[in-house]
Amino acid sequence: MISAQAVKELRERTGAGMMDCKNALIEANGDIEKAIDILREKGLAAAAKKAGRTANEGLVEAYIHGGGRIGVLVEVNCETDFVANTEEFRNFVKEICMQIAAANPKYISKEDVPQEVLEKEKEILRAQALNEGKPANVIDRIVEGRLEKFYKENCLLEQEYIRDPEKTVKDLLNEMIAKLGENIVIRRFARFERGEGIEK
């Protein structure tokens, strides 16, 4: 028997609907952590279904960090102004601003990395592996593995979420899509850091 308290806790932690929480707990035999994983998997499925829908409402949010040391401007889109005006959506956009301020991504997704940047990175990684004396037959695999690290450092959606390293920003986005029932797109951002690019 699944307790109402467990359902309530799962709802508070995931934002999923009551029946979804109850069913996930039944499937997980009452294990809340396992139920969270089940909901996240289902959330990903829900997010994939919504990905094709047009998102042209949303918010532009500004965030200034550290007494004016770092500034971030971000645009996040959703499908309706109703969702754009919810506290959950606003908080999500603020979280994205803080993520960008703290983790300094260069791109939104892997697909946004220019081909020439990727080729240059692969060249550097290949040279590093050769200099380390790695056998030629495993170099490509090593480069691919290290390229994943490059993506995790430089692509917003691949980064560890600053408040929960178990999640990526993409996981957070997919949870929000599942919770709010609309396609949500992180459209663009700009990050400024005082003194950046100035010769010291």
Swiss-Prot record:
Top-level lineage group: Bacteria
Region named Involved in Mg(2+) ion dislocation from EF-Tu: 80-83
Q: Which Pfam families match?
A: EF_TS (PF00889)
InterPro entries registered for this protein in UniProt = EF-Ts_dimer_sf, Transl_elong_EFTs/EF1B, Transl_elong_EFTs/EF1B_dimer, Transl_elong_Ts_CS, UBA-like_sf
Which PROSITE patterns does its entry note? EF_TS_1 (PS01126), EF_TS_2 (PS01127)
Q: Its Gene Ontology molecular function terms? A: translation elongation factor activity
Annotated S-S bridges: none
Name of the protein this chain belongs to: Elongation factor Ts
- Highest lineage ranks of the organism? Bacteria, Bacillati, Bacillota, Clostridia, Thermoanaerobacterales
